[in-house]
């Protein structure tokens, strides 16, 4: 509804503050930034780049071995078996020490990235874009595939444009931007925003065309249920007491379709 779209979400965007991406936690996605003592930085953009930088560190005598190579990781092999050989989370990634142009060691920034950045990156992460997931990513996939040298002949390029297929294989519809997404109204400052922010920064595009925004479950006094407040009802307890179908029917009949 307009009250959520141009209202709640629009007001959030109009009064937007800078997004602090770092989090001082252990579990999560490490920030791929290495710093030296002079505040020089290296931001790593792929596992292939990290592999290459570790090789430089080994050559400079900073690291003794390349742990990715030691585990048999093969750059360019995007199979699950290959990626199961390595773990780039803490504490393992913190043992990787890179080298700057002066031969000095560089240590990883200890913070993690906001988990909402992970959520907002979903359209790209699910396809491992822009690595092997470029072909059917978005409506401009033909240009992307051609620019990434996946297509070597004009015949293949024409096939992609005319038949939406690649080397005889039909391509699924474009994944980005999404036709619609669905989440609770509280995601105007969460998932809706992070999807929109990252898509704008990276592609100057919307991440979704339509939104179905559902309401929130309230308590007997009309307040939002919250684990922090302690006014929640355990659904499993209700299912155990009344059965799954009565609970499901109650939820359906007490929520208007437009809520």
Task: For the regions a language model picked out, list residue spans one by one.
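Structured secondary-structure scaffolds
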Residues: 1-259
């Amino acid at each position: 509804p307009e009250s959520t779209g141009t209202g709640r979400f629009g007001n959030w965007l109009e009064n937007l503050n800078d997004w602090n991406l770092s989090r001082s936690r252990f579990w999560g996605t490490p920030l791929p930034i290495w710093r030296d003592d002079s505040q020089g930085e290296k931001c790593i953009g792929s596992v292939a780049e990290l592999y290459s930088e570790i090789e430089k560190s080994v050559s400079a005598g900073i690291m003794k071995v390349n742990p990715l190579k030691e585990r048999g990781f093969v750059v360019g092999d995007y199979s699950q078996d290959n990626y199961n050989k390595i773990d780039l989370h803490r504490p393992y990634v913190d043992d990787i020490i890179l080298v700057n142009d002066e031969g000095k060691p560089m240590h990883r920034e200890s913070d993690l990235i906001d988990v909402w950045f992970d959520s907002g990156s979903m359209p790209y992460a699910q396809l491992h874009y822009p690595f092997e997931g470029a072909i059917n990513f978005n409506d401009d996939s033909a240009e992307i595939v051609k620019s990434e040298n996946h297509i070597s002949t004009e015949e293949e390029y024409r096939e992609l444009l005319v038949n939406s297929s690649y080397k005889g294989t039909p391509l699924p519809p474009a994944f980005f931007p999404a036709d619609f997404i669905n989440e609770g109204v509280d995601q105007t400052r969460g998932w809706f925003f992070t999807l929109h922010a990252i898509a704008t920064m990276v592609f100057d595009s919307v991440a979704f065309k339509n939104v179905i925004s559902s309401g929130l479950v309230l308590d007997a006094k009309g307040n939002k249920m919250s684990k922090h407040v302690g006014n929640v009802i355990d659904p499993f307890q209700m299912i155990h007491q009344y059965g799954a179908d009565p609970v499901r029917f109650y939820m359906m009949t007490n929520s208007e379709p437009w809520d």
